[in-house]
């Protein structure tokens, strides 16, 4: 089975878990939790959120 990565936080998703967000243009985003889903819907950037994979990388650079 194919493992997917959470679009927002970067965590690996087990097959059959998580949420799928589909935009009107047909692009799809996989989310691991409602926390990631709500942050994405609010327009927050993963690199500015400290608990995400991309945010942790940004903290190391600063």
Swiss-Prot record:
Listed HAMAP family: Ribosomal_eL24
C4-type Zn finger ranges: 6-36
MF terms (GO), sorted A to Z: rRNA binding; structural constituent of ribosome; zinc ion binding
Keywords attached to this entry: Metal-binding, Ribonucleoprotein, Ribosomal protein, RNA-binding, rRNA-binding, Zinc, Zinc-finger
Cofactor note: Binds 1 zinc ion per subunit.
Organism (species): Methanosarcina acetivorans (strain ATCC 35395 / DSM 2834 / JCM 12185 / C2A)
Positions annotated to bind Zn(2+): 6, 9, 32, 36
GO cellular component, one term: ribonucleoprotein complex
Native organism taxonomy: Archaea, Methanobacteriati, Methanobacteriota, Stenosarchaea group, Methanomicrobia
Protein family membership: Belongs to the eukaryotic ribosomal protein eL24 family.
Highest taxon above the source species: Archaea
Protein name, per record: Large ribosomal subunit protein eL24
Cofactors demanded by this protein: Zn(2+)
Gene3D superfamilies (alphabetical): Ribosomal protein L24e (2.30.170.20)
Pfam families tied to this protein: Ribosomal_L24e
Gene Ontology biological process terms in this record: translation
Subunit structure, interactors included: Part of the 50S ribosomal subunit. Forms a cluster with proteins L3 and L14.
Cited function: Binds to the 23S rRNA.
């Amino acid at each position: 089975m194919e493992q997917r990565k959470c679009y927002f936080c970067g965590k690996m998703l087990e097959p059959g878990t998580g949420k799928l967000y589909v935009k009107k243009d047909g692009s799809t985003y996989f989310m691991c939790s409602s926390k990631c889903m709500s942050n994405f819907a609010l327009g927050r950037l993963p690199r500015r959120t400290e608990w995400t994979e991309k945010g942790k990388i940004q903290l190391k650079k600063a």
